[in-house]
Amino acid sequence: MAAKEVLFAGDARAKMLTGVNILANAVKVTLGPKGRNVVLDKSFGSPVITKDGVSVAKEIELEDKFENMGAQMVKEVASKANDAAGDGTTTATVLAQSIVNEGLKAVAAGMNPMDLKRGIDKAVIAAVAELKALSVPCSDTKAIAQVGTISANSDKEIGDIIAQAMEKVGRNSGVITVEEGQSLENELDVVEGMQFDRGYLSPYFINSPEKGTVELDNPFILLVDKKISNIRELLPTLEAVAKASKPLLIIAEDLEGEALATLVVNNMRGIVKVSAVKAPGFGDRRKAMLQDIAVLTGGTVISEEIGLELEKATVEDLGTAKRVIITKDDTTIIDGAGEEAGINGRVSQIKAQIEEATSDYDKEKLQERMAKLAGGVAVIKVGAATEMEMKEKKDRVEDALNATRAAVEEGVVPGGGVALVRAASKLVDLVGDNEDQNHGIKVALRAMEAPLRQIVTNAGDEASVVINAVKAGSGNFGYNAATGEYNDMIEMGILDPTKVTRSALQFAGSIAGLMITTEAMVAEIPKDDSAPDMGGMGGMGGMGGMM
């Protein structure tokens, strides 16, 4: 086991704080409508220019092990916020940096770290309740477009196209994907399709490694209502598909052992392009969903219950689709070859079942199935002049899409950092059990001003002046950093999803609290890989006389 270096107390916290500040300072310049770009070097190809906080955070790795630990913990804040709400990574990073800096000052002054953490936790819980009270539902297309616009760094075109996509495929149940377009303009395509929450059974099926996805064009789709473990059952189908030179997607109850291993080997050798996923749902619901996919793709479910055997399956039993995209978590079938009359009949059948259903859960699941059959998939094609611009714009569209989904889910609050300032101003009378907890509460409340300060700083204005002006107002009154005006944020269309702001605050408070209570850090001592000493060559000095 390699030797370790251990740092304690102030030394450990100082190193950790350096790492926190390096990462946070690189991320926070992207915040707000006038946020700056960050250029990321890539080992091949042109550098990437981005205003996406989580993309910047992911690139940062520091040489000093202890500083790197601090940076990685803040990276965790950004990535947790991104996973929970799909946006708010920069806000979460700014909040965490402020809490850690102020908290560690208090620890250095002799306060109890555990009490500080309890105070911070208390303030965060109270602030989340205030944010929920401030929240208003996001129900109309205009509000959805405004949320998308703000999240895409004030790009109105992106906000509008996302609102259109949601209008066409449904706000709650519709599936929206983002792709690279072929033109300079953003385009919206609505394609008949279905998405379900089952990913590839083996990462060896991946054929688009940069995205980590499996993409199959014009595949055959084999639907099987049982577990497949014996490859012999699949051989006739595989041979028929190989002759047709088309890819194959297998959707079955499960695939294991020899069958899965053989498919992986065939795929890697290029004999037949194949991928496999588990069928969605469980029990009777799985049977129904397999039947939905069969109707959508024009295939037949191979089920022994109706006398069909897998070994006797023919190409006629297989469904087809224009495209299938499989990630580690879900599968999207685009433009299935099923007949419209069959799909409409199936939708009517599900509608009738919804009317008869007694439990809310059953109704919800049936509505999901109907949306997947009837709603289709909206594809936003991002247009740009160069590859660099394309990557940057695609990041922003994905952020904006996540933000609008979060807004539909939990509503919206006034944007531009105002909601956090309002929540903090309502909590000035909040007290803890002792003086150190009170200070922890103050640390959290002061941190809640940090996102607004950073937005104003990035816009080139004086943060303290703006903070005081916003605090003097009430309700939705705030500062529009894009135009330099003060007004009602919701009327100006500056909205943040409640879920994004709430998640950012909760994750920042949680991880920053852990950092404040750190008392020791352990890291491996780096090996010295310098070249060995060439001491034996010293005797060659006498060659000087040969001149």
UniProtKB/Swiss-Prot annotation:
| First-tier enzyme category under EC | isomerase
Q: Where in the cell is it found?
A: Cytoplasm
Highest taxon of the lineage? Bacteria
User: What keywords are annotated for this sequence in UniProt?
Assistant: ATP-binding, Chaperone, Cytoplasm, Isomerase, Nucleotide-binding
Write one Gene Ontology MF term.
Answer: ATP binding
Reaction(s) this enzyme catalyzes, per UniProt: ATP + H2O + a folded polypeptide = ADP + phosphate + an unfolded polypeptide
Pfam families found in the cross-reference section: Cpn60_TCP1
Q: Name the EC number(s).
A: 5.6.1.7
Please provide, in alphabetical order, the Gene Ontology terms of the cellular component aspect for this entry: cytoplasm
Residue spans making up a coiled coil are none
Q: Which residues form the signal peptide?
A: none
Instruction: State any GO BP term from the record.
Output: protein refolding
Record-listed ATP binding positions = 30-33, 51, 87-91, 416, 480-482, 496
Q: Which family does it belong to?
A: Belongs to the chaperonin (HSP60) family.
Outline what the protein does: Together with its co-chaperonin GroES, plays an essential role in assisting protein folding. The GroEL-GroES system forms a nano-cage that allows encapsulation of the non-native substrate proteins and provides a physical environment optimized to promote and accelerate protein folding.
Description of how the protein assembles with itself and partners = Forms a cylinder of 14 subunits composed of two heptameric rings stacked back-to-back. Interacts with the co-chaperonin GroES.
- Write the protein's name: Chaperonin GroEL
Origin species: Pseudoalteromonas translucida (strain TAC 125)
